[in-house]
């Protein structure tokens, strides 16, 4: 199971530590957190606690050149429109998760999640969700795909083709949804099941509606 810290920080926030702890405690999977920073600050309290308490959690750093090499995204992260984008961290996260799972296979999850059950039996699954104004679509916050799954190659090619750097979500969930429909030649996402990819209902990975999300940074006490 893989998590990504793409902001450039070398430590975990308490909320991120909770995501790792819940994943490590609820699942039989080995949990890996990958940082884009040059080093990991093991003296930070949250990071240190995770390493001491959870033996099935490992921390790594990664070089972008190695992550994107031999994929359609190899030149992507060097483009001017990517380097100058106001949403660089978001776009890096969207791209890196796809390249990583393409290369190694496995389960990916965002760092703002809580794992409440064993994920080790889930294979080739993507969760659906609903977004105001766009209806039902697939989300890229939690998914499992096999190593070198051809769908992931199509997603990466789509990223390169549509990227402008001007829209926050242009290579995120809606692109993933289009890629799945094109790859399996279906209009109804429920029809994908017979093709070896299981689309899970929103209650599986995204039970909370976006309207009830709480953003602590905006709270005034």
Model-derived segments and their meaning:
Residues 1-93, 109-221:
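Glycosyltransferase-associated regions of secretory-pathway enzymes
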Residues 94-105:
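Small-residue hinge/turn detector
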């Amino acid at each position: 199971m893989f998590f990504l810290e793409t902001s450039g920080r070398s430590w975990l926030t308490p909320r991120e530590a909770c995501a790792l702890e819940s994943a490590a405690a609820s699942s039989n999977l080995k949990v890996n957190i990958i940082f884009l920073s040059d080093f990991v600050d093991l003296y930070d309290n949250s990071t240190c606690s995770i390493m001491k308490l959870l033996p099935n959690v490992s921390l790594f750093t990664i070089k972008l050149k190695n992550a994107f090499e031999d994929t359609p995204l190899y030149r992507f992260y060097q483009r001017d429109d990517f380097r100058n984008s106001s949403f660089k961290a978001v776009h890096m996260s969207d791209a890196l998760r796809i390249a990583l799972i393409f290369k190694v296979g496995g389960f990916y999850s965002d760092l703002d999640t809580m794992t409440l059950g064993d994920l080790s039996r889930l294979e080739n699954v993507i969760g659906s969700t609903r977004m105001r104004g766009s209806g039902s679509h697939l989300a890229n916050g939690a998914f499992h795909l096999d190593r070198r799954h051809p769908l992931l190659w199509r997603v990466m090619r789509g990223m390169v083709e549509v990227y402008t750097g001007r829209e926050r979500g242009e290579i995120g969930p809606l692109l993933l949804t289009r890629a799945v429909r094109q790859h399996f030649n279906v209009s109804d996402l429920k029809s994908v099941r017979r093709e070896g990819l299981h689309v899970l209902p929103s209650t599986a990975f995204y039970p909370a509606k976006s309207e009830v999300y709480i953003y602590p940074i905006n709270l005034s006490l």
